[in-house]
Amino acid sequence: IGNYKIVTLCGSTRFKREFLEVQKRLTLEGNIVISVGLFSHSEDNKVWENMDEGTLTKTKSMLDDMHKRKIDLSDAIYVINVGGYIGDNTKSEIEYAKMTGKEIMYLESTNVLKR
């Protein structure tokens, strides 16, 4: 949009600190940054406690789909891959970004999925 690249952050929500650091850095570099709505592997995990299994499944599916829509809005994704860790959901997001022609950037260099 305008002179600004839109970048969606992808990665395990266990890396909340890194998400916040990268979000700040990319914003100060002149990017519009889209991040996750909650950090389910950190203190936000309480959100799941009172959900029945059906609601939990639907909610997680909705959040996964919403993240793909965030990628649709973006020019690029930025993968938060601390220690080289890339989980299954993040791998799926990387593949989706590739299929839709998005630039893919990584916090840490990796050879994962560069076949």
Spell out what each predicted region is.
Residues 1-115:
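Conserved catalytic or regulatory cores that recognize and/or transform ribose-phosphate-containing ligands
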